[in-house]
Regions:
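Surface-exposed, low-hydrophobicity beta-strand/loop segments enriched in small/polar/acidic residues
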Residues: 1-119
Length: 119
């Protein structure tokens, strides 16, 4: 059985079409879609909130994630500018590890570990 750690935040933009995308802290208790490729992030959005509604964010454990490129099982994952996942490159933040692989535009299983920046 996989355990997840969730945070309850407030969506600071309409996120109805952003479920399973990668998000980050925007302001006090608020989140927005991640906009800086390879930068540090908070976690993966687990629901579909409108602006001002409760947003559930998975910050640790196994979750679904939306791929912005082909993902290979076992690869470390970072974020694209559009909040999707891609394989990490040197100097980028490693959100976690892909447990399954998939094609771009599909969902895969991501183990969120917050591994820091890749050297």
């Amino acid at each position: 059985m996989s355990q997840k750690t969730y945070l309850s935040m407030i969506a600071r933009e309409n996120m109805e079409n952003m479920q399973y995308k990668i998000v980050n802290v925007h302001d006090a208790n608020g989140i927005k879609l991640r906009v800086a490729a390879g930068a540090g992030v908070l976690g993966v959005l687990d629901n579909k909130p409108k602006s001002g509604e409760n947003a559930t964010v998975v910050v640790a454990g196994l979750t679904r994630c939306f791929a912005g490129a082909t993902i290979t099982a076992g690869s470390f994952i970072t974020v694209t500018a559009s909040g999707t996942a891609t394989a990490v490159a040197s100097g980028q933040y490693m959100l976690g590890k892909a447990i399954t692989g998939c094609a771009s535009g599909s969902h895969f299983q991501l183990l969120i570990q917050h591994n820091g920046y890749r050297g």
